[in-house]
Structure formats: C-alpha cells, structure tokens
C-alpha cells in the first residue's frame, strides 16, 4: 500500500521523463503544480512530505523513495541533496 498517494501523483505526473521539455526547472514544476491544485490537495502533499522526511532516511534512501514514487528528477545533478531538495519543495508548497 502506498503511504504517499498525493506525492506519488505529484512526482509521477509532474516530474515525468519529459518534465524538462515542459518547464524551465524544478522550481517551475513545483509552482505550476501548486497553481493547478486546490489548497486542500497541496496541504495533503505537505503532510505527506512531513511524514516522508520524518522517517529520518539517509539521502540515498530518500532518493530511492522519491524515485519509487515516480520522480525522474534527481536534485543531485543540480548540486543539491535529496533531503535539502524535499525540504525546499515543502517550503515552496506553503501558501
């Protein structure tokens, strides 16, 4: 059973293999998703991010978890770690 259905939808639908063709960067993807979804759905994503980050996984394990949720984006290619990037996503999803 998937503990993070909202994040799975977000990562698999918005950070798919061609996401770079549709957006100028990862922040643009996050902003577009935030604007496309209602506040309640975005709040669920924030809650799921809280739970994922609370698992206290190391960076490789966080990366594996996010990839398992369907993300094709790898923040390490942009000089960031997985925890750092997920924390930035969390901040960006706040109103």
Which sequence ranges carry the predicted segments?
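A glycine-biased, small/acidic residue-tolerant capping/turn segment at secondary-structure junctions
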Residues: 60-64
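Charged/polar positions within long, soluble alpha-helices
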Residues: 54-58, 91-94
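Amphipathic alpha-helical interaction modules
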Residues: 19-57
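Amphipathic alpha-helical binding modules
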Residues: 66-95
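Charge-rich, solvent-exposed alpha-helical interaction surfaces
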Residues: 10, 29-32, 48, 65-69, ...
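Short terminal alpha-helical segments
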Residues: 1-32, 90
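Alpha-helix boundary/N-cap detector
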Residues: 2, 40, 44, 77-80, ...
């Amino acid at each position: 059973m998937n503990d993070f259905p909202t994040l799975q939808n977000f990562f698999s639908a918005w950070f798919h293999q061609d996401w770079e063709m549709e957006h100028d960067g990862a922040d643009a993807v996050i902003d577009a998703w935030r604007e496309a979804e209602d506040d309640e759905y975005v709040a669920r994503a924030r809650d799921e991010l809280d739970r994922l980050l609370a698992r206290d996984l190391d960076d490789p394990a966080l990366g594996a978890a996010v990839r398992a949720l369907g993300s094709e984006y790898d923040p390490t290619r942009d000089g960031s770690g997985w925890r750092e990037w997920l924390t930035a996503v969390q901040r960006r999803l706040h109103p």
